Amino acid sequence: MPSPFFAEEKDIPENQNVGNKRWKKLIKGEGSDDGKEKSSDDDDSSSSTKGLFGWRGDTSSGNLFDFPNTLTDVGETKQIVDATTIVDQLEAADLGAALNLKLSFLKQDFDELPVIKKLPDNLNDTIVAKSDNLEKTSKTNSTFYKDNGDSSEKQGSAESKNSPKTQLKEIFNGQNGDSGNLGKLAEQLQKTDSTKMEARSQTWQLRNAVSLKTTNMAQSDENYLLLDAAIPAFETSSQSPQSSGTISGSGALVNLTSTSVNLTQQKSSTTPLNQRIVRNSTGVKLLALEGLLYYVVGSSNKQQSSSSTIATSLAQNQSNNNQEQEINSSLQKNLLKFRAFQAKN
């Protein structure tokens, strides 16, 4: 079973086929660090040879991945940690996303890898591709996010020199050296002469995200289509609860039609590491990391506009009391720091 965004193995030269190998190892559980195939005798638990598929359970709303509540053994733990954080420089996710973009949109040769470019530290290697081909991009197994763009670009015809878009242009004027895979993707997208796709970098809150920005002309909505796989640590906040309980669609980064986004934290500080991912045709619908549960539920408020979302969290303040708080626009950007490996339905 190929990954949802890695090219077919037969289409990639052996020395460049990193993505499919990582997919097989981390997701399917095939092969080990030394390149040898695992046998069922390698571990007492047969699930240890199945990668993330070992915890897959089909549900009416998509695939459910229930990872172990405690990570104690070496083999399974490394598979899970690698797959959810991509500790080896996001290698599998970034190359996979780059290959997918190249094959689906850029129509380049299968064996041509992007040129490497280093992004400034304040951009944190974050690349967004903008496309008005919503029909094509929406068919991938990814999650959509909504943003209104960089405010500095809307204040006048002249772009701010500090805007991500301006900095991205400077990157490709040869001001920086070569670096990681996200930089590769940035260069490749920037070189693309197409009205249907635009390379763009976001701020630090969206770091390490490789995504497609699509425009729905009928609804005038812009959505971010997430392609990569890393799940960095979520930054909790000790801010006081906001006075209002609803964030309008125009101010929300998460765009999930007729749904609310609820963030809750386990009340017990001793809650073990628990990770869970629910997927359906539109993407990740639930995931948790280090005791923090992030999940999407249908809105029970019939008066709520389908274009709006509610984002709340149950966080601990400095006095160690649990309190529910609204996630403001800035904190919502942290939602984009949570990605799930693109497991095919």
Curated annotation (Swiss-Prot):
Residues 1-58, 139-165 are annotated as: Disordered. Residues 154-165 have a biased composition (Polar residues). It comes from Mycoplasma pneumoniae (strain ATCC 29342 / M129 / Subtype 1). Pfam families: DUF3713. This is Uncharacterized protein MPN_438. InterPro entries: DUF3713. Residues 27-39 have a biased composition (Basic and acidic residues). Belongs to the MG307/MG309/MG338 family.
